[in-house]
């Protein structure tokens, strides 16, 4: 049957965690107050504000309180969809103004070209919004990589720690589980993908990170698909 598609995690797998934690997250925290003030009547932003109030169980929260909630969620690394949507919108401005480029590991830049040449389908699955993923790969320090991808998945597909999310991906891309390889640095994500029947591979870029009973690689250079 063979592998026909590769689904990659982003942070820690294709992208340095430090770029997310030290560049993108602080940028979004700093920009949130002005962004919400200036865009609160935009339909998408307004929906995110309402969703934030619903999740926080604070229906009467004013804009300042909503900002506090969202900034707290950033510090807690909450995977809440309204936060991820707003971060994507804020980062879009940062990329457009040239304030940063998306960090992508060089070995993935070469691998994604190799996989594409092999006619393998390539997808990303991240807790960051689909828009944020597209921004990362289109403004990467390796150039625009988006044409190499067949699609992207985020929290709307499901929680990355839940088997159902991976079942949903399989249903969307219409491949059998054994035709799909999921690559991530996070053990719990790999377990969930494995429970859905996917093939799995753990990316171990840091010798101190937790590892599980999975095939392991330290670089995409080691991932050769026959």
UniProtKB/Swiss-Prot annotation:
Q: Which CDD domains match?
A: HAD_EP
SUPFAM superfamilies documented for this protein? HAD-like
Molecular function GO labels: 2,3-diketo-5-methylthiopentyl-1-phosphate enolase activity; 2-hydroxy-3-keto-5-methylthiopentenyl-1-phosphate phosphatase activity; acireductone synthase activity; magnesium ion binding
**Annotated catalysed reactions:** 5-methylsulfanyl-2,3-dioxopentyl phosphate + H2O = 1,2-dihydroxy-5-(methylsulfanyl)pent-1-en-3-one + phosphate
Swiss-Prot/TrEMBL GO biological process terms: L-methionine salvage from methylthioadenosine
Q: Which cofactor does it need?
A: Mg(2+)
- Cofactor note (record): Binds 1 Mg(2+) ion per subunit.
One Pfam family matching this protein = Hydrolase
Q: What class of enzyme is it?
A: hydrolase
Keywords assigned by UniProt, alphabetized: Amino-acid biosynthesis, Hydrolase, Magnesium, Metal-binding, Methionine biosynthesis
Q: In which pathway does it act?
A: Amino-acid biosynthesis; L-methionine biosynthesis via salvage pathway; L-methionine from S-methyl-5-thio-alpha-D-ribose 1-phosphate: step 3/6; Amino-acid biosynthesis; L-methionine biosynthesis via salvage pathway; L-methionine from S-methyl-5-thio-alpha-D-ribose 1-phosphate: step 4/6
**InterPro entries according to UniProt:** Enolase-ppase_E1, HAD-like_sf, HAD-SF_hydro_IA, HAD_sf
Q: What EC number(s) does its UniProt record assign? A: 3.1.3.77
> What family does this chain come from, according to its entry?
Belongs to the HAD-like hydrolase superfamily. MasA/MtnC family.
State its role.
Bifunctional enzyme that catalyzes the enolization of 2,3-diketo-5-methylthiopentyl-1-phosphate (DK-MTP-1-P) into the intermediate 2-hydroxy-3-keto-5-methylthiopentenyl-1-phosphate (HK-MTPenyl-1-P), which is then dephosphorylated to form the acireductone 1,2-dihydroxy-3-keto-5-methylthiopentene (DHK-MTPene).
Which NCBIfam families does this entry report, sorted A to Z? enolase-ppase, HAD-SF-IA-v1
How does the record describe its quaternary structure? Answer: Monomer.
The molecule here is called Enolase-phosphatase E1
State the taxonomy lineage: Bacteria, Pseudomonadati, Pseudomonadota, Gammaproteobacteria, Alteromonadales
């Amino acid at each position: 049957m063979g592998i026909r598609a590769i689904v990659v995690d982003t942070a820690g797998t294709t992208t340095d965690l430090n770029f997310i934690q030290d560049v993108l997250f602080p940028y979004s925290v700093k920009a949130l107050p002005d962004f919400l003030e200036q865009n609160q009547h935009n339909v998408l932003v307004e929906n995110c504000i309402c969703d934030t109030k619903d999740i926080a169980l604070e229906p009467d929260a004013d804009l300042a309180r909503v900002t506090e909630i969202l900034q707290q969620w950033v510090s807690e690394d909450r995977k809440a969809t309204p936060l991820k949507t707003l971060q994507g919108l804020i980062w879009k401005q940062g990329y457009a103004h040239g304030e940063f480029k998306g960090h992508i590991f060089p070995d993935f830049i070469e691998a994604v070209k190799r996989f594409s040449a092999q006619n393998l389908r390539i997808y990303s699955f991240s807790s960051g919004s689909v828009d944020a993923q597209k921004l990362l790969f289109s403004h990467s320090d390796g150039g625009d990589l988006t044409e190499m991808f067949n699609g992207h998945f985020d929290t709307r597909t499901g929680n990355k720690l839940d088997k159902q999310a991976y079942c949903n991906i399989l249903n969307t891309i219409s491949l059998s589980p054994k035709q799909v390889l999921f690559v991530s640095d996070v053990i719990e994500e790999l377990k969930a993908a494995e429970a859905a029947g996917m093939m799995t591979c753990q990316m171990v870029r840091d010798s101190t990170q937790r590892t599980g009973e999975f095939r392991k690689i330290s670089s995409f250079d080691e991932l050769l698909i026959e």
